[in-house]
């Protein structure tokens, strides 16, 4: 019996090692499918233009981002522009739809998603140095089709579930769990229509919204994604006059 236990323990440990290796292998295949780490790292800025259709309203979207974690998005509806931005240390926004036409610093909870989005390469690249943990959870289904499932636990405690196409190894769905003040917020993002930009594959079609309410999801269609274009770091920073009124922005 003792020998049998040792044999079973040996195979159990081997299976755990293989499980861990599979997560690394899938991440490697995903990055290779996108164009390879060298080409990914060769992109330093991005500019996008897109159309958003949320059913009851439509909007024009644009964004600029710069390595490693500068990000700004603009949402235009009926001539009014909402802004959300992160300068690497502070997140801020302009919300004219809520009657706030002056830039305002964002709180920790409301800025979490924006800061995650500002990660230029995403959580799979340099995961360990970012404090992210990646696990392989086996196979799962996305709209009836098979997919590899990865669990990504971010440094801040939020969890992402990546679903990879078994043929292309590109992500086709990402589920997000945000843990805020004792509650869990769940959302889902569907990705498709991948096209190369400077040798790196990007999704030109996205559908995003609450996980359990498909009718509330918004569809985003990218008209243009440009890489290594000139951007101004000043665009990511909260305007000086506002920052002076908010010492915590420094």
What are these regions (language model features)?
Residues 1-6:
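Positively charged n-region of N-terminal signal peptides that target proteins for export
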Residues 7-18:
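Bacterial N-terminal signal peptides
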Residues 9, 41, 127-129, 201, ...:
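A generic structural signal for short, non-catalytic loop/turn and secondary-structure boundary residues
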Residues 19-32, 39, 92-158, 178-185, ...:
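Flexible, processing/modification-adjacent segments and terminal tails
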Residues 24-99, 135-138:
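N-terminal mature ectodomain segment of secretory-pathway/periplasmic proteins
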Residues 45, 131-133, 219:
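A residue-level signal for beta-strand positions that form part of recognition/binding surfaces
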Residues 63-70, 87-90, 109-110, 165-168, ...:
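A short, sequence-level motif marking secondary-structure junctions
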Residues 80, 145-237:
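Gly/Pro-enriched, hydrophobic low-complexity segments
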């Amino acid at each position: 019996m003792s020998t049998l236990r040792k044999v079973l323990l040996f195979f159990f440990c081997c299976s755990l090692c293989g499980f861990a290796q599979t997560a690394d292998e899938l991440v490697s295949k995903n990055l290779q499918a996108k164009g390879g780490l060298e080409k990914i790292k060769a992109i330093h800025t991005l500019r996008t233009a897109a159309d958003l259709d949320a059913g009851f309203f439509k909007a024009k979207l644009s964004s600029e981002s710069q390595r490693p974690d500068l990000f700004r998005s603009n949402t235009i509806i009926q001539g009014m522009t909402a802004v959300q931005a992160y300068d690497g240390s502070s997140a801020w926004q302009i919300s004219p739809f809520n009657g706030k036409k002056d830039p305002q610093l964002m709180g920790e909870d409301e800025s979490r998603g924006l800061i995650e989005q500002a990660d230029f390469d995403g959580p799979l690249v340099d995961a360990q140095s970012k404090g992210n943990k990646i696990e392989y959870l086996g196979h799962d289904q996305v709209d009836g089709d098979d997919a590899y499932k990865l669990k990504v636990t971010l440094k801040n405690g939020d969890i992402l579930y990546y679903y990879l196409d078994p043929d292309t190894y590109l992500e086709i769905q990402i589920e997000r769990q945000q843990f805020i003040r004792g509650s869990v917020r769940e959302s889902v993002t569907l990705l498709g229509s991948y096209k190369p930009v400077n040798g790196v594959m990007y999704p030109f079609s996205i559908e995003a919204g609450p996980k359990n309410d498909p009718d509330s999801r918004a569809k985003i269609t990218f008209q243009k994604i440009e890489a290594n274009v000139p951007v101004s770091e000043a665009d990511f920073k909260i305007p000086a006059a506002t920052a002076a009124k908010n010492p915590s922005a420094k």
